[in-house]
């Protein structure tokens, strides 16, 4: 089963450059002109939502075995934590180097900080590890930010 894609087209961009309009035209996504017309329970992709949440409740790095991660994270949802998935990041730690997504707690926290615009904090965090600067250089090259 595929996830249905919807776009809220507010007409604020140049229509010739609007990727949402192109997706709708190609029938790869369904376009909606107003939020009230969207079906309930959709996930709005809001790059600022997690930043506010992080400033209020902080970031929680979960230090658990990858062998027990599924059950561990299922239990955490019961405690009112807001789960978020990081985009694919490549670890450089000695244990799981190169195994996409298998981050250490420190890499996950640094990745989240960098995504939320706290690059200096992420760099400081990764400075505690010999391999830390390589993680930042690989996943968050300065020219890309």
Regions found by a protein language model. Name each.
Residues 75-145:
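C-terminal folded domains that constitute the principal catalytic or ligand-binding module
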């Amino acid at each position: 089963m595929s996830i249905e894609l919807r776009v809220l087209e507010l007409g604020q961009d140049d229509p010739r450059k609007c990727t949402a309009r192109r997706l709708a035209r190609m029938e790869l996504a369904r376009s909606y002109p107003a939020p009230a017309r969207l079906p309930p329970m959709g996930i709005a992709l809001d790059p600022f939502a997690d930043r506010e949440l992080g400033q209020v409740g902080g970031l929680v790095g979960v230090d658990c075995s990858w062998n027990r991660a599924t059950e561990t994270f299922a239990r955490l949802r019961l405690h009112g934590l807001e789960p978020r998935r990081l985009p694919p990041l490549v670890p450089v730690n000695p244990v799981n180097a190169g195994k996409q997504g298998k981050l250490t707690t420190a890499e996950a926290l640094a990745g989240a900080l960098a995504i939320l615009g706290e690059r200096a904090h992420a760099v400081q965090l990764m400075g505690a590890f010999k391999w830390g600067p390589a993680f930042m250089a690989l996943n968050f090259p300065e020219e890309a930010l």
